[in-house]
């Protein structure tokens, strides 16, 4: 899975993250920190967010802090069966590049890991 994610980054020129989908609790929200929120980062790191930092959260915890890293809870492990690849972009980056990177990651994993792609979607601010 990590190779699929790195391959997508190299081919599309965007950052792609991967998480264990089954460990996500409820709906996902892309949010901006008020400052002081905490996250249990991968490998035992502890993040204290600054005001304005971009984060992805489920209904219980922060899953990823942009430019700091992902959480331990949803880390891909040997027993992971369902993954979510995701990416962020700043205004001015066309969604086609995100879709290209996510497609490379999903197709690579499906081909070499024997998985199935459920969907590839790009959400733009204000579209939902």
List each model region and its residues:
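RNA/tRNA-interacting regions in translation and RNA-turnover enzymes
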Residues: 1-128
């Amino acid at each position: 899975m990590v190779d699929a994610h790195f391959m997508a980054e190299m081919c599309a020129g965007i950052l792609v993250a991967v998480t264990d989908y089954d460990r996500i609790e409820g709906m996902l929200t892309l949010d901006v920190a008020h400052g002081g929120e905490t996250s249990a980062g991968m490998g035992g790191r502890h993040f204290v967010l600054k005001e304005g930092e971009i984060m992805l959260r489920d209904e219980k915890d922060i899953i990823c802090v942009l430019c700091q890293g992902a959480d331990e809870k949803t880390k891909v492990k040997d027993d992971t069966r369902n993954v979510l690849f995701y990416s962020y972009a700043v205004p001015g980056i066309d969604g086609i590049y995100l879709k290209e990177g996510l497609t490379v990651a999903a197709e690579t994993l499906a081909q070499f890991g024997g998985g199935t792609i459920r969907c590839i979607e790009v959400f733009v601010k204000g579209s939902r």
